[in-house]
Structures are given as structure tokens and as C-alpha cells.
A protein has these predicted regions:
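Ferredoxin-reductase
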Residues: 2-87
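FNR/FR-type flavoprotein reductase catalytic core
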Residues: 77-164
Length: 164
């Protein structure tokens, strides 16, 4: 776990008040595990003082190396500040934090269940499971359709069940 200043490579509103923020991945994050999170600090100053705990949502190869994504809802000043970052700006993060989870090697069929923003770390897992040739069914839940992670952003072979 280290404090790192990461450059923003992409930022977008995905749906409703949910945003994705892609950041350059520092070397200290190479060992990140599914289910881990970062504390993202919402300014270069001390207001707001506390970081925001945000799950590591996805990983990818970018133009300048590995990148990781944070998926979050805008619910206050801190997450609003994060949502307004643009490529080239920086965000300070501490992590990876928490006890991630592993998948048993012999399991071929996986059922992943997540609701609302709670599905964020499962998307990275689904990406990797599909890449490994495993079958994935994902149950996405939310209070309304507006709070469901868009199924078209999942790998095409993932079977999706939506519940509201």
C-alpha cells in the first residue's frame, strides 16, 4: 500500500450519476487483486480531508502502459471533484487496500452477483474470466433500470440477468 499520484487518461459519465475514471497504474499496483479498493483523495488540498473508498473496477493496456479504472457515483463534493477530472490532470490514491479475493483454478462456470455500484469490482473479474475461457453469468441488480451497470459494456459472452 502506497500513496501515489496518478495521471487521468480518460473520464466519462457512464449512466445516471455514475462515472468512470481511468488512471495510469503505478508499479505498486501491479499486485492488485479482484475486490480491492483505493482511497482516492478528492483534491490537491485538504478539503475534503478524507479520501473516498472506491473499488478497482477494471484494468487495461493503455497507450503508455497499464491503466486501472474507478467506477463511482457522484454523491458529494469529493466524488463530484473526481468526476470533473480530465485527461492530463492527477488524482492522489492510496492502495491497493482491502483483502481481495481469488478464484479457484478448476472452476469453469462462474456466477457473479452485484447490485448498483457494488458490481464495480466484479466487472474486472468477469473480463479476466472470459479471457481465460470460462463461462460467466452475471446478475446485476438495482433499485431501478437507471442504477444498472450497462450490460453492453460487459464482454459479449457474459450471460446477463437484470433485476430491479
Amino acid at each position: 500500500m502506497q500513496s501515489e499520484v496518478c495521471e487521468v487518461t480518460e473520464s466519462a459519465r457512464l449512466y445516471g450519476n455514475t462515472y468512470i475514471l481511468w488512471l495510469q497504474m503505478p508499479a505498486s499496483f501491479q499486485s492488485a487483486a479482484y475486490g480491492q479498493f483505493v482511497m482516492a483523495y478528492a483534491s490537491e488540498y485538504s478539503d475534503p480531508l478524507l479520501g473516498r473508498a472506491i473499488s478497482i473496477h477494471r484494468m487495461r493496456e493503455g497507450e503508455r502502459g497499464r491503466e486501472f479504472a474507478l467506477l463511482f457515483d457522484v454523491v458529494g463534493r469529493g466524488t463530484d471533484w473526481l468526476a470533473r477530472r480530465v485527461p492530463g490532470e492527477s488524482v492522489r490514491v492510496v492502495g491497493p487496500l482491502g483483502r481481495g479475493f481469488e478464484v479457484r483454478p478448476g472452476v469453469q462456470r462462474m456466477l457473479l452477483v452485484g447490485g448498483g455500484i457494488g458490481c464495480a469490482p466484479l466487472i474486472w473479474l468477469a473480463d479476466d474470466l472470459v479471457e481465460q475461457g470460462r463461462e460467466v453469468t452475471m446478475i446485476l441488480g438495482g433499485r431501478s433500470d437507471a442504477q444498472i451497470f450497462p450490460p453492453h459494456l460487459l464482454p459479449p459472452s457474459v450471460e446477463v440477468v437484470v433485476t430491479t
